[in-house]
């Protein structure tokens, strides 16, 4: 079995090293990741310039583009490697609730799913760097189960690992996406020349962390698995929309 691995934190991140190291115990691995941090780029493609693929000393490949670019290149340019599965991560920080719409980590998995492959995005609910041992232990548990009976059809799973000590992980729960309040979207400032500039502000506070949500269960110490879908059609609003537009 072949697994293509990517992320949005870049090929030098700790998370992708952990993911590649553990996955290599179960399958053949090829890493194709952005050359730098591309967090928050979602499913964007690089269309205004050509891309380059280079190989680092550790064997990882890197691209001067987005996570989505990396999936396309990883599946297109290697005659000796065609992926059966795509793993993305492990992201330094959670990707839960509305965050999944912006996440390059989730986007890499999404693109693979659109290409017909089973895909999984992994994130650690911590940005301090203190819980990589937890992430690695959780990954061993998750992948041992995954490869015992691998999915045969395309799936898209978003997995978040809690920020607790390894011995305090309480298990695995299937969870729905929670929600956030809108954050302070734009922060005005001045550059050293006195010119007006703007920063995109921090994310908002969690507004839905009820039991059964990814926020709630992960904060309670569980590894959360959320099955995602791509179809954005609001089927329950179809009839009402037809009435508004006076269609038959």
UniProtKB/Swiss-Prot annotation:
Any GO molecular function: 5'-nucleotidase activity
Binding-site residues for a divalent metal cation, renumbered to this chain: 8-9, 39, 91
Metal-binding recorded as keyword: yes
EC number: 3.1.3.5
Key words of the record: Cytoplasm, Hydrolase, Metal-binding, Nucleotide-binding
UniProt keyword Cytoplasm, yes or no: yes
Cofactor note: Binds 1 divalent metal cation per subunit.
Compartments in which it is found: Cytoplasm
Cofactor(s) needed: a divalent metal cation
Record PANTHER family: 5'-NUCLEOTIDASE SURE (PTHR30457), 5'_3'-NUCLEOTIDASE SURE (PTHR30457:SF12)
HAMAP family recorded: SurE (MF_00060)
Annotated protein name in UniProt: 5'-nucleotidase SurE
Species for this entry: Neisseria meningitidis serogroup A / serotype 4A (strain DSM 15465 / Z2491)
Lineage: Bacteria, Pseudomonadati, Pseudomonadota, Betaproteobacteria, Neisseriales
Recorded name of the encoding gene: surE
